[in-house]
Amino acid sequence: MAVISMKQLLEAGVHFGHQTRRWNPKMAKYIFTERNGIHVIDLQQTVKLADQAYEFIRDAAANDAVILFVGTKKQAAEAVKDEAIRAGQYFINHRWLGGTLTNWGTIQKRIARLKEINRMEEDGTFEVLPKKEVALLNKQRARLEKFLGGIADMPRIPDVMFVVDPHKEQIAVKEAKKLGIPVVAMVDTNTDPDDIDVIIPANDDAIRAVKLITAKMADAIIEGNQGEDSVAAVEAELAAEPASTESIEELVEVVEGK
């Protein structure tokens, strides 16, 4: 049984790509058709490839992999944070700082500073410092927390990276490739898929689409860590849905109200 049904993908708008003039020709094999100047993603492939991504992430988690969720645009930020936390993993959902992976030593020093400021508040140091200095420390902490809070407890560079919109997160993807870190990603029709190891063809601009795919990757981690019982409720929900016999053409027409 597919981990994500065609019905779920359609309802979340996963099939809507970019305007045809903005496409990347390397995504041609994942495009089903064009409607009103918009490319429509082949959801039959998305169903199959989402299964492969789920299995990849699940197996990595079963081997105690450190998995980093990356999505810094506004449509992705909330889901990336929430699902990474739910799965007990790590995230970056604001601007990617160049060198986050390739200059991990420097990043660790900044994380150490963040933790030091937190300790200063906890042990009462703030109470004996001038208010102006405390204000500066709080400002510094807020900035560090914004960019590094999601990886503050990450024990090492990640073993796998899940990315929403690798076109936007090109720096993150390049750093991962340089270090040999496999990348699983939601790949829209405007993106070069060549640097992505495990591709999920999908609309990466709709909040519902991002939430759906990101949540499934979190489910994969939970299953890998704890066994199938932890996602039994999700599977039961899918099993309750009637099997669809519609073709993708018919589904697209239904969505467009034809």
UniProtKB/Swiss-Prot annotation:
Any one GO cellular component localisation term in the record: cytosolic small ribosomal subunit
Keyword Signal: no
Molecular function GO labels: structural constituent of ribosome
GO biological process, one term: translation
Gene3D superfamilies: Glucose-6-phosphate isomerase like protein, domain 1 (3.40.50.10490), Helix hairpin bin (1.10.287.610)
Family matches, as CDD domains: RPS2
Keywords linked to the UniProt accession: Ribonucleoprotein, Ribosomal protein
Coiled-coil stretches: none
Keyword hit for Chaperone: no
InterPro entries xref list: Ribosomal_uS2, Ribosomal_uS2_bac/mit/plastid, Ribosomal_uS2_CS, Ribosomal_uS2_flav_dom_sf
Protein family (similarity comment): Belongs to the universal ribosomal protein uS2 family.
UniProt protein name: Small ribosomal subunit protein uS2
Organism: Streptococcus suis (strain 98HAH33)
